[in-house]
Amino acid sequence: MSTLLIDLKGKELEQEEVELLSHPLVAGLILFTRNFEDREQIQELIRSVRQRVKKPLLITVDQEGGRVQRFRDGFTMLPSMQAFQETLSATEQVSFAKEAGWQMAAEMIALDIDLSFAPVLDLGHECRAIGDRSFSSDVKSAVNLAINFIDGMHQAGMASTGKHFPGHGHVLADSHLETPYDDRAKDEIFGYDLQPFQQLISQNKLDAIMPAHVIYGQCDSQPASGSEYWLKEILRKKLNFQGTIFSDDLGMKGAGVMGNFVERSKKALNAGCDLLLLCNEREGVIQVLDNLKLTENEPHFMARQARLKNLFKRSVIEWNDLVLDQRWKLNHRNLADIQSRWLDIQAAKND
């Protein structure tokens, strides 16, 4: 049973990485800025992975836009999600959100990447880890922009991943560095933070969801990423979500309360995650591969494997054809202009 997504150390594929990626438990990999030099190099790296690993691998990246954009030189400068609301009219916002989703997905698919983990559905901009990655603090605006962004992704042929369930926007701590605690009342979380996820699930817009490494103290004692309450009771049963559940990176400090890497993996799977990310922890990956025992007799084996298949890219796009496309050319200029205006607004605030 394939369940783990791992990372690569550098810009070239190492033999050890071929062996790790070939392990039956490994479902795919996630790419980072450290793997990127330029477009030709990253395409060659991906081609090498596809050729040397003799099984289908889900290749992923965080190419959200704004400050979370792993590939920059030679690619469209995608706006931060907050930039749409801050720089555009109401009509322009939804139009350009859709174009940003399409542009991002088309460029990644042209590299032979299956999935970019997007969009962020957290509300508000106060959390250090989220900030301008959030569309808005207003539920209606965030949902409207997210729908259009996802429609653009789907049009290009990429699945969507809503994150970070049930909402990371109202904790100041960064789960990359520590485990955040959100002690707000359950009614507030359900009536506000959860709404983008609930509404997008009801409209069948989300192919996957990534829960937060946040403990919501009035609801459960475990981080959402390792919580049966959040993933089985709320996400699967109450919201009737049928797509894939990714863990956020189990190498993050925010996941540390769940134990060592093997324990974190087991807890996330038992809580309801289908696929696990473990990054920047090569020894941790090896520990998990050596000690996590999953078989085809697992109760959710068939459902999990079916969900994995639904995440692979649904189109073939050639880079040389893409850059001749008038839609791409127009977006390439307009989206960069939106981000430039947003950066100017931020700079003026800081003066």
From Swiss-Prot:
Pathway: Cell wall biogenesis; peptidoglycan recycling. InterPro entries: Beta_hexosaminidase_bac, Glyco_hydro_3_AS, Glyco_hydro_3_N, Glyco_hydro_3_N_sf, Glycoside_hydrolase_SF, NagZ_Beta-hexosaminidase. Keywords: Cell cycle, Cell division, Cell shape, Cell wall biogenesis/degradation, Cytoplasm, Glycosidase, Hydrolase, Peptidoglycan synthesis. GO terms for biological process: carbohydrate metabolic process; cell division; cell wall organization; peptidoglycan biosynthetic process; peptidoglycan turnover; regulation of cell shape. GO terms for cellular component: cytoplasm. The record marks 174 as: Important for catalytic activity. Its EC number is 3.2.1.52. It holds the Pfam family Glyco_hydro_3. It catalyses: Hydrolysis of terminal non-reducing N-acetyl-D-hexosamine residues in N-acetyl-beta-D-hexosaminides. PROSITE patterns: GLYCOSYL_HYDROL_F3. The active site is at residues 176, 248. Substrate binds at residues 62, 70, 133, 163-164. The keyword Cell division applies. SUPFAM superfamilies: (Trans)glycosidases. Its main location: cytoplasm. It is found in: Cytoplasm. GO terms for molecular function: beta-N-acetylhexosaminidase activity. Plays a role in peptidoglycan recycling by cleaving the terminal beta-1,4-linked N-acetylglucosamine (GlcNAc) from peptide-linked peptidoglycan fragments, giving rise to free GlcNAc, anhydro-N-acetylmuramic acid and anhydro-N-acetylmuramic acid-linked peptides. Belongs to the glycosyl hydrolase 3 family. NagZ subfamily. This is Beta-hexosaminidase. It comes from Haemophilus influenzae (strain 86-028NP).
